[in-house]
Amino acid sequence: LIAPLKELAEYDEIRKVTRQGKGTVALSGCVDSQKLHMIYGLSDGLKYKVIVTYSDLKAKEIYEEYRFYDRNVMLYPAKDLIFFQADIHGNQLVQERIKTLRRVVEGKPVTIVTTYAALMTPQVLWEEKDIIRTERGGSLDESKLASRLVAMGYEKAYQVESPGQFSIRGGIVDIFDLTEENPYRIELWGEEVESIRSFDILSQRSIEKLVSITVYPVSYTHLRA
């Protein structure tokens, strides 16, 4: 994709300057499609990249177009200060922000498309102690687990129906991580984790057996249990 760019002396010069990290480089005269191609070429090989624009609408447009170049691109929208806490369940904005933060915490390559407003919002990344990790054969205390999940922003329910909820009944723990398409089901024998699997929310049927899982907070800041 960047072979044609490499033939341009100007591109080679700009790439060298940007890799030196000395000051700001300003480019002009490119149409939108050329801008994204240039961004991809100049940042090729970098593990972390951030594309900042002026509005969520423009960020969404860039995100959709940039997916052609980079499968690791993710959208990080700004908070809606009025409606942000109104309904955590199924909230696309919250899910997109949490998924992006998760990828950063996991240290995976990512290109983040965001806005000035989103960057200006104070944000604290989670620490290892803010995350729940468990595996088959490990141990879990139901009472302590429930307290931690509530502290992480999860809502306790009789039966899990939407992302951000969890339930504990009869040695079975269901958790619907906000960043996953399907919830997890953990079966306990006493405090021993006997099995872990993902399951379908409607049919309740198992989808995949899992060796281990990582559960991330639903909220950005939370009380630590």
Question: What is the meaning of each model-derived region?
Answer:
Residues 1-224:
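ASCE RecA-like P-loop NTPase motor cores
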